[in-house]
């Protein structure tokens, strides 16, 4: 391993700002007392995780829907990885009410919450007098409560749920929000096993395998009684994969090792949507990488305010309800989140500066699943849609922007601000380029090697490079081909990479129909898109959005009526059509856009539509946001606030 690391770093000589941070030692810091620490390679944590590593986490927590708080005790078992060099453990926290800290059962130890450092939070310093010998494990038991400033949890009132009967709570910890639930080493460079013991009046799901529920306690003052729900996770996972949800949740089988959970009224529809493809997807990716290691693969379909398409929490993928469209056209989200079970969950990026290692690999594997199930042309079809998303992100940021690089500089920055399609699609294109360079048969041998080498570990881009070059060192043809890779350009050059030649067989008719719409006189008919898959309509709408001259309002209205795009349940279609209508300044789509923004919390749709709506009707955009801001998840709300600033 050391050999690989030195190879990986010595090759990249033209990027002197990147150093092997794991080998850098400093002897002072500004936050608290002087202490010897090894500088970590993740700039978005305040923890001294290169001196101490969390090995196991026990979360004994209660969910209080009345006060909208999670409270209890979290015990971190931390191993000293130096020999008495560090006399304190520093943990990440953000807006957590820390009430006590016990060190190996001793509550008389010294601990301090330091000054808050934006955007990362408040470091919690726990004194360990004399330090600890290398390999010693120290248990920190931290009693705490979340606060109303917690950025990881969203609380829904009964009125915000579909059946209006019970409250609901769910977490979203990626990228650096676990620290707002409990103090931790909030970095993907640290992995821990977990025990969850969660008390709630409503059913609970977590990112672990269920042990069952019991230990009923009667409620007081007319409140509901509670059960203790237990889960365990024996595969070490990073802090951002800690996940909880509690509410009126019903469950059904969608395969031999898979369940779907959602609201009781939505269960039948969700089961139908997912049961055909889930096991097929699992069996397909197992042939590409290796067998699934997390025992169960389940899907929790969340209320509509969930900010992402899906979140790859182990055992239970958290998914947006927008995938339940009644036509099985959006189940590729499941393929994506399933692929994360290998890329991201088993093998993790060491910091959010190397996020492409999670998402680029996942998009790559997702498209390999699609190709195996539907045919190779579908991989290129998906890639064409992805290329448009990449172009949109680069256009939004500007082609010279830091956040359009594969490796981004996040020092002092909130990783959420860098979230876009760039790590997904630019990362995919880098891997797709390497596949074509060495040849698919050779590349397919590298895939399981890579995921075996880094299983249960974290890596950065230089580790990836070293692993790749080492694997192909004995293959003279592949090694020769890899000599042509301009690593510096791929890693550090902003903007778009070279566009590959795609198989356009599935999109040619989409392009042809879009071409017809360039004429102001074109009269549409429902037969134009008869027999089309939803994603083909997506490609058509994307092409129309590229027009130099937008449609007229009359054209926009004719399109919506002929192709039934206003009332479709498929948000992938309605959101893009509204984008076309807003560009056309078609006032008949303004109110439907505002209504959709009150029903969907997925940032992919919400942020895009607000950016377009604010251009044509700032007043309506601001009013819509003010009306719905409590509906949105805190992560989404914060990003839209930034989007709407003048």
Curated annotation (Swiss-Prot):
Keyword Nuclease set for record = no
Q: In which pathway does it act?
A: Lipid metabolism; leukotriene B4 biosynthesis
* Single GO MF descriptor: aminopeptidase activity
Q: What class of enzyme is it?
A: hydrolase
Documented EC number(s):
3.3.2.6
Q: Where are the transmembrane segments?
A: none
Instruction: List keywords of the entry alphabetically.
Output: Cytoplasm, Hydrolase, Leukotriene biosynthesis, Metal-binding, Metalloprotease, Nucleus, Protease, Zinc
Q: Which domain of life is it from?
A: Eukaryota
Give me the residues that bind a peptide, please: 172-174, 307-312
* Biological processes annotated in GO: cytoplasm to vacuole targeting by the NVT pathway; lipid metabolic process; peptide catabolic process; protein catabolic process; proteolysis
The chemistry this enzyme catalyses reads: leukotriene A4 + H2O = leukotriene B4
Task: List, separated by semicolons, the cofactors it needs.
Answer: Zn(2+)
Name the active site residues.
337 (proton acceptor), 424 (proton donor)
Q: How is the cofactor bound?
A: Binds 1 zinc ion per subunit.
Q: Name one GO cellular component term.
A: multivesicular body
For Zn(2+), which residues are the binding ones?
A: 336, 340, 359
State the compartments where it is located: Cytoplasm; Nucleus
Its biological purpose = Aminopeptidase that preferentially cleaves tripeptides. Also has low epoxide hydrolase activity (in vitro). Can hydrolyze an epoxide moiety of LTA(4) to form LTB(4) (in vitro).
Know the name of this protein? Answer: Leukotriene A-4 hydrolase homolog
